[in-house]
Amino acid sequence: MSAEASPETGRFRTKSSPELFFPATDSEGEEQNDVPLTIVHPTQSTSSKFSINIASSSRPQHGITTGDFETTSQTSAHDDVDDDFSIVGHNPASSHPQGTIVAPRRKRSLQQAHSHHSSSSSSPVPSAPVIRADFRKGFLGEFVCEGWSLSKGRGYCSPGTKIVIERPKSKSTDVGAPKPGRKDSGPVRLVNGKVVGGVKSKQMTLGSMMAKKVEPAKKVKATTDQIIRFRNERGFEIGRLSIHEAGFLTHLLDTGVIQLSGNVIDCPQNLTTGCTILLNIKVYLARKAFENFGKHKREEHFSFWKDQRETAMEEAMRLRKDSLRSLFERIGVKPIQSSALSKVTPIQGVLNRQKGPDLEGSRLRSSPSTSTAEEKGKGRAAMRAVDDDEEDSGDEAEKLDEKQMNEIDSIYRKAQQGDTRLDEMDPPSTFLYTLRPYQKQALTWMNAREKGDSSVRNESLHPLWEEYLFKKDQLPGEPIEISDDDEQPDSTRKFYWNPYSGELSLKFPTSQNLSRGGILADAMGMGKTCMMASLIHTNREEKPAGNLESQTRDGVEGEIDEEPASKRIKFKQVTLSNQWRAVPTAPKVESFPRATLVVCPVSLAAQWHDELRKMSQQGSINSYVWYGGDRVDIEALLAGDGKERVDVIVTSYGTLTSEYQKWLRTKDRPNYEGGSLYDHEFLRIVLDEAHNIRNRLAMVSKACYELKGQRRWALTGTPIVNRLEDLYSLLHFLRITPWGNYSFFRSFVTVPFLNQDHKALNVVQYILESCLLRREKTMRDKDGRLIVDLPPKTVEIKVLQFSRAERQIYKFLEERAKKRFIELDADGRAMSNYTSILAMLMKLRQCVDHPLLVLGKSGEDGELGEKILESGAGNGEGNLRDMIAMYAGGIRAETPDDVDKAYAAKVLKELGEQEDTPICELCSNEMFDEVLLPCYHRSCQDCIVEWIGTCEDQNKIASCPSCGKGPIKLADLRSVQRRHKRVNPITDAYPGGRDPNSKSSNDTTVTLGKVDLVTSTKLRALLRQLEEIRQEDPKAKALVFSQFTSFLDLIEATLTKQGIRWLRFDGTMSQAQRANTIEEFGRKTNEPLILLISLKAGGVGLNLTMANYVFLMDTWWNEAIEQQAIDRVHRLGQNKPVYVTRYIIKGTVEKRIMKIQRSKTALVNASLSNGAKTKETTLADIKKIFGMDEEDSEGEVY
């Protein structure tokens, strides 16, 4: 028989009755110090009013005074604290009604009870939460819910009965706990020189030491129940809350976030098991809810190489966030002030998307160790090294299509609305250039950003937080107070909630954006270098207000600054002279940072140096190119003074990456003495063409992240290339919180946008308005004038027709590639053989430029290309290699070689005496690439070759179109080569310096030779247009762009043969060679000059306004890259009309790529170029490129 108290009288009786307040099962199976069962009687000091708030797990700290919202009795100060469930705010000696039996309890010290609160967080919340000493709890609100009775009989409750709500203590099973058979002798301690205590184990022997170690057993986490019980004030259990209500309350009660109280609204007089009881529940936020939560170092749970599953801390954050959100919705709590972000983004949708273990976004697919079978099935190659020119920044599925890119453009326009109203600021007199009005406005904005006067007010609410108000807890019988809407709420009743992380705070979370810098994203050719140079002159060395760098880094991904190497204790080298002792030397006293570090592509390093020299008054700004063999000791470079002072250091992304890798290898060595870029803090860090760091996982990005600088700037015309996460990398570099935190950025920027949540655009706009300045050439100022007045630009697309031989080679190659693709697609193996398909597409694009390019190997795809070349052999059709060899060598001449001599002797005199340019009989235009027929008539090479091919297609004998003599074969044609002597301006100016018997400088030498059939259709079109330009403007300069350096080689040889002067600029050249090329191209000349330039190496950043003709020889995968190439010429400083010519071949992949660019994706695929073999293009796009789209029509213009 068990002794119990009657629910009516409190007297003991010997019969079964409801469970007691502390059930015996709570302490079963635990090793603990037992306390005898005692009957606690009420004392005089017992409060007449019982508080019915329940806290789980642990007690609050002692000594806390009366709270603002509820008066409670003092807790007694004793050393042992009850770790079971207790009533908050009551003396343990007086918290139980008379006759209640207190069950055994486990003792734990107060210090131990609260030791688990000292973790850290990566969320942008105040580092140390400020909780008022008198704060105990705040009334959040109340709601009505149902409960289920677990008791039978009368007297348990009635309408108005106050109830106490509690949770049964959770238990976890430790598989690795000591076995019951082993004796625990208490804590380990030292007694008489011997270690005693602890669980006894076997003695360690040599055999046991050599035996295989057994991994410790993992703790088995017990499943969390959702049972919340409620009892009356006399301690008798009445029932439990419904599962629907208990679902979101369970976690909050277990973690001590909330306290609950309530009363019965309605219930049956005679309770039965399972009957419904209507309850009114009051919810209070406890003091513990505002303590540090979720603060942890990122390194403790995130590793690129470790298992990327959700950690326990992340799970706790997610459960807390979801539970609080459900609670707020259940009570109907609304914020009194929403952040700017909350006003533009649907929090509900963002939070729903954050459910589950993907708190860190796409970490799973970022790990190389978690490659799936599906990825292997798609034929992805191994991860390649990321260089400066080409990087992958994420999954192909997250690329933005044309519609989404247009939405990004609209964001830019909205963010630019207020830019025309910026004030204008003049640079100091040491800056020699005159800024345009929009550049002066940019200087105003940049200066304000560096001074900390950003548009975001320091006292504005943090964009991730919302402001709420505690309600007034109305006691029963008190009149209901109606607050005035105009009345300012009491500041002590305010609290703040972060719906994205679940954190709560009593302190106002300000939007303290400590970043001093931003993104200058003006369109290409608007003078970003000039504007940054003016800023360097405006803001020189100054004393920093504090360690701003460390402050900003703390809020971004939990990173922690290491101690600079220059401040560490250094050691001299150990030698015999110092007797093998390491002698510490005092750290050097560093001056305030004064130098600006500019990181740019290697092709722009010399340009930065030259531009700074031209724009600066002599001696005001000294710059140094830190690259290659010129990398002197950085410490000595920064320590220079006077004439040796260096204000700007210019380096390349490749050099910085190399320095970063070296620093990682040596920085932790005990004898490391510094001397790296990463051991010094710079006044300003500038990333030119900053989209080079768009891949957050690339080594070049990490190298930029680690740089130390007080101010940070990113210069790029394309902050978002093709993914929203391109923007994240810039924000992370700039230390802009919270957007520089990847989990936050992905949670409510990337994922909502990809889910077509259009309100996510407003979030991006909100971000950009605070840190980005972007103007375009088409924008107008406040007076309606264009902010940039540039000469007109004319873009012409020349659609060319293949020659007969080229068409045969291309069709042969296309049919084989298409046949192979159809076979793979039919078998469902297209994507698993993706690399092979890309190799075939590459060969097609090369064949369009010149058939000889197909013979070359393209990196790792060369072997696949060889298979294509050999295809068709043995089936009577010949193979592709033989066809190209026939094309390159022409038809072998059947006439002997001595025919040339007699042939030439007869006509050379006549040709040399002619002064007028002859007219072609076939095209009725001036002859280009003049050839001589056996009948002495002449024609354009293209015209007569096409004429002969047409006759052969019609099974006719080719004859001369002028006289009808024939037959004519290609071997019978002779090329008329007229070479004009180059004019020497020095000797030509002084007739005495020339031999009077010599011929005039305008004399032309005429020779005959075999017809060169190696030139392609595009090459002939280029030469024809260059010849026209030479006739119109003898001093013209032009750029010829191609993505294939092998094609540039062929163009180079052809220009040399034609006597046209050229220069070369590509990725194989050193920085010094590139600088010399640009310098040579900029010099004045009296003859045409052509710059052959690689699209990848010279497509961005260069200032080539000395030219005004641009030729794009092939179609690039991204139209924006082509536009960047054009802007090398059409930019500030250009005073001539710009003419752009794009060559495409009708009926080829070029036409189809352009169609896809314009109509669908604007991003066919980077994998169509060399090296990008890990992308995924949709099958639909591949079919269109192969010409398998039914809508594809050859009748289109292109």
Curated annotation (Swiss-Prot):
Organism: Cryptococcus neoformans var. neoformans serotype D (strain B-3501A) (Filobasidiella neoformans)
Function text: Probable helicase, member of the UBC2/RAD6 epistasis group. Functions with DNA repair protein RAD18 in error-free postreplication DNA repair. Involved in the maintenance of wild-type rates of instability of simple repetitive sequences such as poly(GT) repeats. Seems to be involved in maintaining a balance which acts in favor of error-prone non-homologous joining during DNA double-strand breaks repairs.
Name the record gives this protein: DNA repair protein RAD5
Polar residues: bias regions: 59-76
Xref: Pfam families: Helicase_C (PF00271), HIRAN (PF08797), SNF2-rel_dom (PF00176), zf-C3HC4 (PF00097)
Zinc finger region(s), RING-type: 920-964
Keyword Zinc-finger: yes
Region (Disordered): 1-129, 348-402, 541-564, 982-1005
A GO cellular-component term linked to this record: cytoplasm
EC number: 3.6.4.-
